[in-house]
Amino acid sequence: VIALTRPNGHPVMLNCDLIESVERNGETIVTLTTGNAVLVRESMEEIERRVVAFKRRIYASAHSGE
C-alpha cells in the first residue's frame, strides 16, 4: 500500500495493485479497478514514485528471503 493525502488533509492508504489509472484535471484523481475514484493532493509523478518505491521494497524482500 502507499500513503496519500486527500484534499482535506486526511491521509489515505491505497493498495497500489488496484490502481487502474491516475489523471490530473485540476486535482489528481486515482481510479481503482473497483471503480472507486479517490482525489488526492499528490502529483501523478509523486504517486508513480511511491508505487515504484513500494514495489522495489516488496521485490527486494522476496529476493532476500525476508
Language-model regions, residue ranges each:
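Eukaryotic intrinsically disordered, low-complexity regulatory linkers and tails enriched in Ser/Thr/Pro
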Residues: 1-66
